[in-house]
Amino acid sequence: VLISLPKRDTDKPSNVTIRGIGGQSLAMRPQVRLTEGRLPRPGSAEILAGQSVARRFAGAGIGETLRFGMRDWTVVGVFDAGSTGFSSEIWGDADQLMQTFRRQAYSSVIFKLSDPSAFDAFKARVESDPRLTVEAKRETRFYADQSEVMAKFLRILGTSLTIIFSLGAVIGAMITMYAAV
């Protein structure tokens, strides 16, 4: 979920991603480590802030309070996710966040198979179950698909600007040559 929070220095709002987590979330992400404070208690209005969020946004430091989803949330921990995008997120109890944002179902579930080569069999079994409406993807594929739309937009924008500026340069050169003659 995206929320808007004011930045510390400018007070201008900027978007921040909120992610619901469970008890094993840090174990699932070995690159993420708690640097300050503690993990949120399940069922509470406590959150973890990524280092980037804690540093850049008002109210996102440890012990501070953020208001979103018509509720006050206390930052009880700060985590470092290295150079990943997770450092720009806020994490809280998944069930509490689902209630706050009136979500009826999880948008994604992340888990680790004991044998990575069993993924294809797992995918076939889950996707063929008529009770479920899911699409199983490896996490790397999920994020690649997410960024593909933006990459396509940027390619089209870049090509369009290149053509426009090229035409402008050609016309400018023609006008200059005509004026010189």
Give names to the regions the model predicted.
Residues L2-P42, V75, W91-A94:
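The feature marks short, hydrophobic/small-residue-biased sequence motifs that occur predominantly
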Residues G23-P30, R103-V109, T162-G168:
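Short, basic, helix/turn surface patches
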Residues G22, A49-G50, D93, E139:
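A secondary-structure boundary/capping signal
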Residues Q24-Q31, A49-G63:
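Short, solvent-exposed hinge/capping segments at secondary-structure junctions
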Residues L39, R55, T65-T74, V78-T159:
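Mechanotransmission and gating elements of multispan inner-membrane complexes involved in transport
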Residues D11-I18, R29, P42-E46, G61, ...:
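Extracytoplasmic
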Residues A151-V181:
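Hydrophobic alpha-helical transmembrane segments of multi-pass inner-membrane transport and secretion
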